[in-house]
């Protein structure tokens, strides 16, 4: 995703976090405290293929990688802004983009990659870093409330494809409307 999509994602999540905070406040002040439940925010889907390699089972993302990458970048930012130690390693990796893997690992460690092919990751991080706190302040949200909402209530629907799916064909069909693929992809 580019900066526009990343900023829209941040805006959407913070809007829902604010809405839920206000609803919970009204419910706590009002009559029915049993309904003190935050509503989830469904962020879309990730189409995945279940793989096993070297004794480990994992999901290969077929569609939704940019959304997952943006969320990982946001998690890195929250780690550093909250001074938290809970996020040690991204659970997202790229088979054909080692520079992106390295860039995400560097973000976890508080560093920005200088590699030319990782600059989109760096620019999205800087964009989120610039806009997160002003957006939260405008919506009267603290960082902890936002982070809790993100990690507990933002939901991505995981859609597994059947094991007999021809992935190259499926991927090609799903991405004909989006960004053109590079040869190695």
Short names for language-model regions:
Residues 27:
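Cationic, low-complexity basic patches in intrinsically disordered or flexible, solvent-exposed regions
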Residues 1-24, 35-185:
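Glycine- and hydrophobic-rich flexible loops that cap the catalytic core of alpha/beta enzyme folds
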């Amino acid at each position: 995703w580019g900066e526009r999509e990343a900023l829209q994602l941040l805006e959407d999540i913070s809007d829902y976090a604010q809405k839920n905070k206000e609803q919970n406040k009204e419910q706590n002040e009002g009559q029915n405290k049993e309904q003190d439940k935050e509503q989830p925010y469904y962020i879309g889907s990730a189409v995945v293929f279940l793989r096993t390699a070297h004794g480990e089972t994992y999901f290969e993302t077929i569609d939704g990688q940019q959304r997952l990458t943006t969320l990982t970048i946001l998690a890195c930012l929250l780690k550093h802004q909250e001074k938290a130690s809970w996020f040690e390693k991204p659970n997202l990796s790229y088979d054909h983009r080692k520079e992106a893997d390295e860039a995400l690992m560097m973000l976890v460690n508080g560093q920005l990659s200088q590699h030319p092919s990782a600059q989109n990751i760096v620019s999205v991080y800087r964009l989120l870093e610039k806009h997160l706190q002003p957006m939260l302040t405008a919506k009267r949200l603290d960082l902890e409330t936002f982070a809790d909402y993100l990690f507990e209530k933002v939901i991505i629907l995981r859609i597994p494809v059947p094991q007999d799916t021809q992935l190259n064909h499926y991927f090609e069909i799903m991405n004909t409307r989006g960004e053109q693929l590079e040869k190695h992809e």
